Amino acid sequence: MAAPTPARPVLTHLLVALFGMGSWAAVNGIWVELPVVVKELPEGWSLPSYVSVLVALGNLGLLVVTLWRRLAPGKDEQVPIRVVQVLGMVGTALLASLWHHVAPVAGQLHSVAFLALAFVLALACCASNVTFLPFLSHLPPRFLRSFFLGQGLSALLPCVLALVQGVGRLECPPAPINGTPGPPLDFLERFPASTFFWALTALLVASAAAFQGLLLLLPPPPSVPTGELGSGLQVGAPGAEEEVEESSPLQEPPSQAAGTTPGPDPKAYQLLSARSACLLGLLAATNALTNGVLPAVQSFSCLPYGRLAYHLAVVLGSAANPLACFLAMGVLCRSLAGLGGLSLLGVFCGGYLMALAVLSPCPPLVGTSAGVVLVVLSWVLCLGVFSYVKVAASSLLHGGGRPALLAAGVAIQVGSLLGAVAMFPPTSIYHVFHSRKDCADPCDS
């Protein structure tokens, strides 16, 4: 079959990115909109802890998908993807209409609609890693990077939308000469939470439409021996040598694929297993840090330097994710040693941020421009480096086909869960970290 025309790969990259955008957009949108909804919901600022628990419980989606695969082996893999997408679209649409509804539970008012829909969306998002990723085994490895770019957009776009909305804007009143300064003055948002959730629904609709477009580009593969993945997209097509090279860590060498098949080499299989385990371990560890440990301390590490530092860290850190995916499209590290070195750089930046959070509300260089630059740069480097490692490790695992990508999705989700569980006691039970109040200077001596 002829190689794909120049327009088709570009369109496929775009559709894959939009498809990936729908993976975590719903839960990311809920997180960035919490400062708005807590003003009207009865849980107040206890609401984030409720959402954290619900997102952790959302990992039950992994069990549901596993059970479905056991009960219906060999069934169409599009079914769970469509279920996840429908849950996301319907959940955010209902959230836009019902988020402010409350009901009495055990004699107290609770935001039952908001919490129930947040749980449904958490189920869908957690299941996306083990449904969306295996589907990409039908595409050459370079499109996997577009998927992770889309996942980065699922965090960046809700952040940008919240900034346009005016989330978190406040003004400190002038301090009196003798006396305590008054409370900070909050600005009214430019549009309500319902509008935000409708916009989020539109993003998920676009993601579902992109998946349908991918299905049109990639009809079911014909029953031919090997190589073809769909119409116009081939692993073995001319010009695809780079795909074979980067997927080789988990693929059979060409010398063995052709001619007589030699007997199994136990040592080679052992090395192959060790390499795969290292890549999966890197995926689990990096996602534990970026999706569990570090988000729990972001406000503690940034807010002592001011709201501007916090917003810059959130937005630029989210932008670092898709930028790292762009970099991986051109330069992909295929060495375990190289990925390990990059991971150590990310751990160093993460350790600095954790130290700032522990020392909050009076970390080093507070009140200086250097402190703001360092904390923002550390967040950008940390999230960017770990995003690159995640994309590179997943690209190398792509050669193992659908089972390897399924294992990658499980590693990502399990790592995220372990990171979140590890941070729950120090943040919510033992209160190791201390926040800084707005318009107050506890470090002024």
Curated annotation (Swiss-Prot):
Where does it live in the cell?
Answer: Cell membrane
Result of altering residue 339 to P: In BVVLS2; loss of riboflavin transport; loss of localization to plasma membrane; no effect on protein abundance
Q: Name one GO molecular function term.
A: 4-hydroxybutyrate receptor activity
Task: Tell me one GO biological process term.
Answer: riboflavin transport
Q: What does this protein do?
A: Plasma membrane transporter mediating the uptake by cells of the water soluble vitamin B2/riboflavin that plays a key role in biochemical oxidation-reduction reactions of the carbohydrate, lipid, and amino acid metabolism. Humans are unable to synthesize vitamin B2/riboflavin and must obtain it via intestinal absorption. May also act as a receptor for 4-hydroxybutyrate.
Record text on activity regulation? Riboflavin transport is Na(+)-independent but moderately pH-sensitive. Activity is strongly inhibited by riboflavin analogs, such as lumiflavin. Weakly inhibited by flavin adenine dinucleotide (FAD) and flavin mononucleotide (FMN).
> What does the UniProt keyword field contain?
Cell membrane, Deafness, Disease variant, Host cell receptor for virus entry, Membrane, Receptor, Transmembrane, Transmembrane helix, Transport
Reported effect, residue 31 to S? In BVVLS2; strong decrease in riboflavin transport; no effect on localization to plasma membrane; no effect on protein abundance
* Species per Swiss-Prot/TrEMBL record: Homo sapiens (Human)
Provide the residue span(s) of the region labelled Disordered: 228-264
- Which Cys residues form disulphide pairs? none
Q: Where are the transmembrane segments?
A: 14-34, 47-67, 86-106, 112-132, 147-167, 196-216, 277-297, 312-332, 339-359, 366-386, 404-424
Q: What is this protein called?
A: Solute carrier family 52, riboflavin transporter, member 2
Outcome of residue 312 to P?
In BVVLS2; decreased riboflavin transport; decreased localization to plasma membrane; no effect on protein abundance
InterPro entries for the chain: Riboflavin_transptr
